[in-house]
Amino acid sequence: MRISTSTGTCGSVFWTQKMYYSCEQAIESIAKAGFDAIDLCFVAYGRKGLPMDAPDWRDWVKRQKENCDKHNLPVTQAHAHYYSVAESMKFTALDWEDNIGRIKRDIEAAGMCQV
């Protein structure tokens, strides 16, 4: 059995918009804490202006996977983008397109990490 936790637990505090720790720092902290597997929380790093929202997101994902490998943390789970059902009642077609695009991107990222 592996013991795992999510990078999302290290990135922000109480789901605030501000990220207090980078994914790299979260991975290192999780390894130092003694976990032997990891959940990459792509949704935490996918808001506007964060790495999973950038044009070079694939390069960022590759670096995170390499960092996990360096710390002997197999990626056993990933969290994709999700949205509030209540908020979705107000979505425009562009909002839906953006949300579906983020979900597809996160699924691809999970595949890149062999989840």
Predicted regions and their residues:
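N-terminal pre-domain/capping segments
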Residues: M1-V115
